[in-house]
Amino acid sequence: MARRIRQWIGFLIMLAGLGLLAGPFLLGAREEKVQEQVVDTFYQDVKKAETEPAANETETREPQDPFYQAAKAYNESLLNGGQSAMTSRADVEQFALSAQDYGVSENVIGTIRIPRMEIELGLYLGANSENMAKGAAIFGMTSLPLGRESENAAIAGHRGWRGAPMFREIQKLQIDDPIYVTTPWQTLVYRVCEIRIVTPEDNSWCRIQPGRTLISLMTCHPYGQNYQRYIVFAELSPEDKPSEEAIRAENAASYDPSPRQITQIHADGTSDTVTVDPAAIRPDGSEYGAVLSNFVILAEDKMRIAAWIGAAVVALSGIWLTVQTLRDFKKGEKHHESE
């Protein structure tokens, strides 16, 4: 009896180990599914709006669309001095507009797709913790991406969240990489034009640059830490969104895996240049940085394989324990019969 109890205890311990092993993968898969649902819901809302046009609406929707007009007026208010009030974290967490007031299921104005990083996320209004747990988020008191002159939409994303990649591999982005932003009115193509590393207190990067049409991606840096911010600027390109085949072809052909030279701006305003290896998401220059970061990435990316291996080990162990238990049971019966 004692032996059988030990066997079942061992079996339960292995099941618990499998749960610990598979847990991060399952959580990550769940988070990615939630993000996919947000994107799908946005496209469904847009499709519904297109099939139910307003009575006074023209073919282009934009001039008469109330949401667009509100977004346009909001951007103009920022250009006329509205960003001067941006002084605290609370200012970027809230947003003056709500997409839900204009028929969008969640407070999402669109999606952002980055082929180099293999992600597409919902674009929430307001960079608060709730929104950033579900996708990318536009800072309050920064522009909405309408494709008009003198805009800078500051878009924040976690450097990975509960197993979902989000902006984790932002260091793979290189100059001229495309970024696609889809709103209820159009899909805009932006091209990466500059990359910086700044301090958390520096908010100059999210300010409007008159005459330029920008989006600015922001995430914590280095990976796994948050004492800096990694900023990627992308400028509006006049091109139309290409076909999926063309997107994949450009993504495969244009990648440069060599280290990048990135401008780093310090708290005192001075700057220098640091080397960032896109294959290693810790660019601090330490000897262990690349090895450590790549191990973390490998562990995260290979969690699916590890989960299956763990499941197989536990399944085989369970079968073996079951067989051993049955054998012991039969031996016990034979022993009683012989007595």
Predicted regions and their residues:
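Solvent-exposed, non-transmembrane regions of membrane-associated and secreted proteins
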Residues: 2-301, 321-335
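Selective detector of the "anchor" transmembrane alpha-helix that sits immediately C-terminal
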Residues: 302-326
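Solvent-exposed, low-complexity, intrinsically disordered
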Residues: 337-339
